[in-house]
Every structure is written in C-alpha cells, then in structure tokens.
C-alpha cells in the first residue's frame, strides 16, 4: 500500500509541476537579455538593419525624411502586438505603429524605435444582415474596397489604394462621397486597441468612449494600436457617374471662380475636386446619379464650356471601376487591378538618402486577392506637402492670387482643391476628434517632388513655401493631420483646433508615460532614451530580467503551495 501511495504522490507531484510550468509561461519581456531575443519570442517576423530587405522595410511610401528604427516587426495577431509593445517598453525603445506608411515626416518609422507594422492584419468578416464588418486594423483601402464589394457594400474613404484603414481613420478619413456620408471615422462602430502597457481595450460609444472619440481623427501613432475595427457599411450605389473635365490652362481664373462659387453649395450627392499641375487643369467628380442629372447640376456653372474644355464622362462603371477611375491616368473604369495592392505594394527604396524614384513595373505578389489581377508596385515618393482649409468667403483678389501662383506651378507639382460642405457643414467640430466640418468649404493640398539634391530641390521648396506664405493667411489656419508638416508653427492647433486640449487629456489618461510619441500632432516632445529611468514603464524601472520567460501569478502561487504540501506528504510516507 505504501508503494502505491508513493507512486500516486510522485505522479501528482509531476502533474503539479506541469501545471505550474504552464501557468507561469506567460510572456515576460523582462526575462530576455536582449531586444532581439524578446522579439523572437513573440514569433512575429522582424527585419533588422543588417538583414536583406532592410532599406525597403524601414520606410513606407514617403521617403523624404529617412528614419533609422532599430527593427521593423510584422505581427499577424493582437497578442503579438501586445508582446511587441511590451518588448519595446522593457528595452527602452519607442513602439511605433505603422499601417499604410504614408507619413510625410516619417513618423511611422522613427529613429531608434521598434516599428510595429500591422499591414498583415488584414482580415475582413462581413455581416450582411447588420451591414457591418469586422476588419483587421492593418488592411489597406484598395483590398478592403474589393472585399466589401464582393458582398455589395463599401465605405467612405480615400481613393489611394495603399492607404491603411487605421491611418485613414486616425486622420479623419475624408474621401469619395464624404459630403454625403461623412468621413471614415464616422462609420467606425468599435475598435480593439493595444494600449501603451500592452493591454487590450475595447473602445466604442459606451466602453472607453473618450478613447474611441480620440481614435477617430486624433492623429496616427497616438493613444494605442488599433488591431481591429468594426465598421458600418454602405450598400453600393445603384447609380452614379464619374467625370473629368480638362482645361489645359485656358481660362483658369474663370474655372477657379466658377468652381469656388459653385461646388461647396452644390448637392450632397456630388464629390468634386479641382486639380492643377504645371501643364493642365482638370475637375474630377463622382455623382450619385445619371449623366442627364449631372448636366442639370453642372451646366449652369459653365464649367463644361470654359475655353477648350474636354469632358470625359462614364455612367456605366462598376463600383470598383469608379474607384479605379480616379487613380487611372487614362481615366477608364476598366483597371480594377489598380486597387489590388496587397500587403507590400511599394517598389524599392534606394538607400538612406532620399533620391528621385523611378517607376517599378513589377507586379505586387504578397497579399493580392485572387481574381482581380495585381497592381504594379508603386514608386516611393520624395515629396514636400502643404495642407490648408478655407472657409466659404474668398474675394476676387484672392482668386487672382491663387491663379497667378497656379500659372507658375513648379515642374511635377500637384495641387488639389477638394470640396467639403454637404453633411459635414451640419456637424459639430467635436463630433469626433476630426474638427474640419462646420465652417469648412475647401481643402487645398499642394505637393512638389524632390530629388534629394539640395541645389536641384531649392526652387521647388521655394515655390511651395511661397504658396504657404501667400495662402496660409487666407485660410482658416487648419491643416489635415494626414498630411503632416514639420514647418507648422502650432501643428496640434492646426490639425485639431478646439479639440487639441481634450486630446491631450485623453492621451495622458491612456498613455501617461508618453509611450506612443512618434508624431508631432499633440505638440509633444520625444522622451529621452538615455535616462537612468525608463520613461516607458510606470514607476520608471523596467521589469527585472530573469533567465526564463516565465511569470509567477496568483494561480501559480496556489499550485506551488500544493506542490509543497505534496512534498511534505511524500516525506511523511
């Protein structure tokens, strides 16, 4: 009988050891000696400076400012995001979230940071009955439009297919038919968020509503990393017309005057922009109606007849075809493959010094959706950008000033005057953190390409600065946070207006140690990484490091107590 008891007790002892080993095998970044060891334990893919592909991994689409993070990671689930944030915290590195990689100032791949690129978190689950979708936080807009279209739905957001959904929502998300439905953030119902300490929170109108408010238009790289969104969907429009009017700079002042006086006050069903380069002007639009109705709206403005206007109209596009229309230089509705940009849509980055990029004709291969072709990899952009909002009032003299600036457009420069108003005019500026609603008539985006050669680039920079100095006083002072500009005197005020102080309070609540500090949006400074105290850990000190990746929790203490009792029992047998 004694031997049976001993066998039973030994078996129980081994079983309890197994339980303890399982229960204390939680991820503990402080148990690893180096950052690479910690990141390897997360099982997320990672690229380091000496690895093949580093030059491509370390930057997104915009390469004017080349940053040097310590590593770029690619999680595929929320747990990995949590662990990566904890690794960065433990080793005094800033966790820097990246979605689409479109930051104008490189804020999604900051120096010495751990970049957490969520672009592989791109799942889409649609509930047709409720017209909602649960979407991975890293998906890009082109693939999202395709997946939603399969079920007969869409959302409101930007035309550019490589833009990330989370980045769009963090910027507000103005896009096609925002005058009818609002911005992308207005369609968000809920977010799953990894916060600064690696915890996961749900944010919606009831749970953590202040965080939910901030995530929609409060700027990227702040508050937390959204790993999943729940979106309200919109049924695909039954009838619509897309159009493009080209003027070749004939009668530009008349075009600008007529456009300015008409577009803002037009029907909510029409989305329209005035675009000008150094060799032509065009008006691009999307109308929720037929061609006859479109003429009834636009003909009284004379915009179809100014100078040598050439109009191209389509009323037979599919929904995806109309999306592709706006990025197709030939203005057709046939190139749906342009939207199918996958998860790695950019061509090569040529080094630490931004250079003039050349086109890449290699098709995208990673993450493309079967049956839709594949977009070509897009060249990365070395551009300088300015953004400003205008109220309705603009004098004849102001129109003339803009006309004269447009006539001297720098080679390759691009300006886009986009119409706001519509439903946005009826919304309070604090509906979400995105404030550019009531009182905003137009948004002006100006971009000039750069080469990386200071001598060659000087005229282009002088030109864009002239626009800034001349037109900023005519604007309402606001700028779109999606087009970050390091030259702004008070970026937080320009991006968020009266919402800035509330955003600071929310940021302090959910990120008291300023862990997510990549962008300039809240006028904050980056904490030192060389201090004796760790600024990323509450209380200042990083977790103690142990040789094994285990953590003793309350359950573990219970199991250990049971083991000790078993040992006592064994001794007394």
Kindly give the residue locations of the regions a language model identified.
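Soluble FAD-dependent oxygen oxidases
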Residues: 2-9, 18-546, 551, 557-562
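Active-site or pore-adjacent capping/gating segments
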Residues: 565
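A periodicity- and composition-biased signal for non-globular, repetitive helical segments
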Residues: 11-12, 568
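C-terminal membrane-anchoring or membrane-association module
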Residues: 569-573
């Amino acid at each position: 009988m004694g031997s049976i008891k001993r066998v039973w007790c030994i078996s129980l002892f081994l079983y309890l050891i197994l339980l303890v080993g399982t229960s204390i095998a939680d991820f503990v970044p402080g148990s690893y000696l180096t950052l690479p060891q910690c990141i390897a334990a997360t099982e997320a893919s990672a690229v380091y400076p000496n690895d093949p592909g580093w030059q491509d991994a370390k930057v997104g689409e915009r390469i004017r400012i080349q940053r040097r993070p310590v590593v770029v990671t690619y999680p595929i689930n929320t747990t990995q995001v949590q662990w990566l944030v904890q690794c960065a915290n433990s080793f005094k590195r800033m966790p820097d979230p990246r979605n689409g990689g479109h930051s104008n100032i490189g804020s999604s791949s900051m120096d010495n940071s751990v970049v957490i690129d969520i672009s592989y978190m791109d799942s889409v689950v649609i509930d047709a009955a409720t017209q909602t979708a649960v979407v991975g936080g890293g998906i890009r807009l082109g693939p999202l439009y395709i997946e939603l279209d399969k079920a007969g739905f869409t959302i409101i957001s930007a035309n550019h297919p490589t833009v990330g959904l989370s980045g769009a929502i963090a910027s507000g998300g103005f896009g096609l038919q925002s005058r009818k439905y609002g911005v992308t953030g207005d369609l968000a119902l809920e977010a799953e968020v990894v916060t600064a300490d690696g915890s996961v929170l749900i944010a919606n109108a009831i749970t953590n509503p202040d965080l939910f408010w901030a995530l929609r238009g409060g700027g990227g790289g702040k508050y937390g990393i959204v790993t999943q969104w729940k979106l309200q969907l919109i049924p695909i429009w039954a009838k619509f017309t897309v159009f493009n009017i080209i003027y070749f700079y004939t009668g530009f002042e008349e075009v600008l005057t007529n456009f300015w006086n008409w577009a803002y006050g037009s029907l909510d069903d029409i989305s329209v922009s005035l675009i000008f380069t150094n060799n032509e002007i065009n008006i691009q639009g999307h109308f929720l109606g037929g061609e006859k109705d479109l003429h009834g709206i636009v003909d009284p403005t004379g915009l179809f007849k100014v100078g040598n206007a050439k109009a191209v109209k389509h009323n037979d596009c599919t929904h995806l075809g109309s999306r592709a229309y706006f990025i197709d230089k030939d203005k057709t509705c046939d190139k749906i493959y342009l939207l199918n940009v996958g998860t790695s849509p950019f061509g090569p980055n040529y080094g630490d010094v931004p250079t003039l990029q050349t086109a890449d004709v290699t098709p995208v291969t990673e993450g493309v959706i079967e049956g839709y072709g594949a977009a070509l990899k897009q060249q990365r952009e070395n551009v300088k950008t300015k953004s400003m909002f205008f109220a309705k009032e603009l004098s004849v003299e102001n129109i003339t000033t803009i006309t004269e600036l447009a006539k001297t457009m720098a080679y390759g420069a691009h300006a886009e005057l986009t119409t706001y108003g519509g439903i946005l005019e009826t919304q309070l500026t604090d509906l979400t953190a995105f404030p550019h609603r009531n009182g905003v008539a137009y948004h002006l985006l100006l971009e000039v390409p750069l080469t990386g050669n200071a001598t060659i680039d000087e005229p282009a920079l002088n030109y864009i600065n002239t626009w800034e100095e001349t037109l900023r006083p005519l604007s309402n002072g606001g700028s779109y946070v999606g087009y970050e500009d390091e030259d702004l005197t008070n970026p937080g005020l320009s991006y968020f207006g009266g919402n800035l102080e509330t955003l600071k309070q929310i940021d302090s609540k959910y990120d008291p140690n300023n862990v997510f500090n990549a962008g300039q949006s809240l006028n904050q400074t980056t904490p030192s990484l060389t201090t004796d105290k760790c600024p990323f850990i509450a209380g200042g000190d990083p977790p103690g490091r142990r040789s094994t990746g285990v953590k003793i929790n309350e359950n573990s203490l219970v199991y250990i107590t049971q083991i000790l009792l078993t040992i006592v029992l064994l001794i007394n047998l």
